Curated annotation (Swiss-Prot):
Biological source species: Salmonella typhimurium (strain 14028s / SGSC 2262)
Keyword Transport among record annotations: yes
Name of the featured protein: Outer membrane porin protein OmpD
Annotated knockout phenotype: Mutants show increased sensitivity to methyl viologen.
One cellular component term from this protein's GO annotations in UniProt: cell outer membrane
Length: 362
């Protein structure tokens, strides 16, 4: 029975975005939950940029207030603290991951604004479930609406106005962010997503299109995209039932996906990419969750280099859950890219990485 309870707890925490949050306050229609994790881990790799201590901690809260029987206000904030920096470096590399607030109108959906996940990640999240790696062929932080990003206004509707269980859709607008780094900038854009889940099976699709900033267009080079618009479309399938998790996604991007780095340390932006991800996992009752995945991103029309693989690896890993709060993991990223003139020019890593760690979460 105890082993079965561990499996149920693990399944629940994997399904929930915020794991086992501690309820700080719940009175008179106001609720505040605190959550966090300490992720103690080390990478082993011949790539000096990847090898070493990667420890960090995260802390966040989720709050909501019942305004009336039809209207609820909510907000969420999440911050990451690096644990592999010297004390003299202070908060260098620490970051705000999420910060948004919104209103939920009963069955009519919710609206929020701030730093949040782009709607394209509604599909990308299905394969971003590996013990440590994964979700890196096209879902990227601060790259338009493919991952966590800033200045997004999002409308979400669950169960299609309460009429069709499992049918969800979202619409999103992102305002212009013109930053120093062209690869993290974006113009005005919009995105759409829709998913349907029934008895463990899920199918979904997403699309987003944005203007590119003048600096992004002007940065065009042999390896940098020159298009005026950035686009992504993605589709996914998944099965999540009976302790089995299977998921696959396919996507294409235009003038969006970043890779490698130039002499100044800035990432290149590919003209076009075709991306495939697939993952399979099984949750044993005694807490072990083995995982295997394959991921590939092919860059198209990369100047004089033509078509090149940007990402390709097999991932083999496992997580062992002592209980819902404590786990340990190992994750082996078997890089299938070979050294070439392209990987050297674009500084694309071809080395394997092994990650091991302990994770405490509440």
């Amino acid at each position: 029975m105890k082993l079965k309870l561990v499996a149920v707890a693990v399944t629940s925490l994997l399904a929930a975005g915020v794991v086992n949050a501690a309820e700080v306050y719940n009175k008179d229609g106001n609720k505040l939950d605190l959550y966090g994790k300490v992720h103690a881990q080390h990478y082993f790799s011949d790539d000096n940029g990847s090898d070493g201590d990667k420890t960090y901690a995260r802390l966040g809260f989720k709050g909501e207030t019942q305004i009336n029987d039809q209207l609820t206000g909510f907000g969420q904030w999440e911050y990451e603290f690096k644990g592999n920096r010297t004390e003299s470096q202070g908060a260098d590399k620490d970051k705000t991951r999420l910060a948004f607030a919104g209103l939920k109108f009963a069955d009519y959906g919710s609206f929020d604004y701030g730093r949040n996940y782009g709607v394209a990640y509604d599909i990308g999240a299905w394969t971003d479930v590996l013990p440590e790696f994964g979700g890196d062929t096209w879902t990227q932080t601060d790259v338009f609406m493919t991952g966590r990003t800033t200045g997004v206004a999002t409308y979400r509707n669950t169960d299609f106005f309460g009429l069709v269980e499992g049918l969800n859709f979202a619409a999103q607008y992102q305002g212009k962010n013109d930053r120093d780094g062209a690869y993290e900038s974006n113009g005005d854009g919009f995105g759409l997503s829709a998913t349907y889940e029934y008895e463990g099976f899920g199918v979904g699709a997403a699309y987003a299109k944005s203007d590119r900033t003048n600096n992004q267009v002007k940065a065009a080079s042999n390896l940098n995209a020159a298009g005026k618009n950035a686009e992504v479309w993605a589709a996914g399938l998944k099965y999540d039932a009976n302790n089995i998790y299977l998921a696959t996604t396919y996507s294409e991007t235009l003038n969006m996906t970043t890779f490698g780095e130039d002499a100044a340390g800035d990432a290149f932006i590919a003209n076009k990419t075709q991306n495939f991800e697939a993952v399979a996992q099984y949750q044993f009752d005694f807490g072990l969750r083995p995982s295997i995945a394959y991921l590939k991103s092919k860059g198209k029309n990369l100047g004089t280099y033509g078509d090149q693989d940007l990402v390709e690896y097999i991932d083999v890993g496992a997580t062992y859950y002592f209980n819902k709060n404590m786990s340990t993991f190992v994750d082996y990223k078997i890089n299938l890219l070979d050294d070439s003139d392209f990987t050297k020019a674009a500084k694309v890593s071809t080395d394997n990485i092994v990650a091991v760690g302990l994770n405490y979460q509440f």
